Amino acid sequence: MSRKALIAANWKMYKTPAEAKAFVDAFLPLVASHTRDEIALFPSPVLLPTVIEAAKGSNVAVGAQNIHFAEEGAYTGETSLNQLQAVGGTHTLIGHSERRQYFAETDEIVNKKLHAALKHGVIPVVCVGEVLAEREAGKTEEVLKTQITGAFVGITPEAAKPIVIAYEPVWAIGTGKTATPEIAVEAHKIIRAEVAKLLGAEVAAAMRILYGGSVKPDNATALIGQEEIDGALVGGASLKPDSFEKIVKY
């Protein structure tokens, strides 16, 4: 089945509004005619209005790095889906490894956020992946199955259609280590098989699974070119327009 790749930039906690606008102004002309893949930028919350305004009318979508599952309320420091949509955001990351690691985000919280995003019509990119100790203990498959199963509780096959999954081998994020294409493909197959078990073969065959773990211009082709890999969630290499352009045009 042909799946349109998504190349996504996770800017994490980098860039000022001026730097973000400069990036978009430089980047858009580089990819203006690029229709093979979808492109999305995920800046930090304070940058969302600036980036969305700068990217308006282009082929580049903009989303949040994190959202809260509540409609509104006394949740200091959080961003609601209503707020995201009010400024024009269309996507959101959910359950990024740094959210799980530093902010105690559990599979149950990921599940609540996924339900909320789908209810609002925001495209969710659900992040899953194992840490180094889990990989070395041979628990990669177990961890991925647990995270997928936990995230998808109560999700119907029909509701699941917009969902994107991003596989992040946590041991390869910001470490300079990269999963080989073979390791990445193996993980993607585990994820797709688990989705098939939960939601059916048709949904699994259509669902996009991105790779996210030290993706750079020099390894993008080898990774995204794999049949099982439907794009990339890019960190550090997405912070410069020319670097991210090379990945988009893998």
Language model region names:
Residues 1-250:
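Active-site loop-to-helix "anion-binding N-cap" substructures in soluble metabolic enzymes
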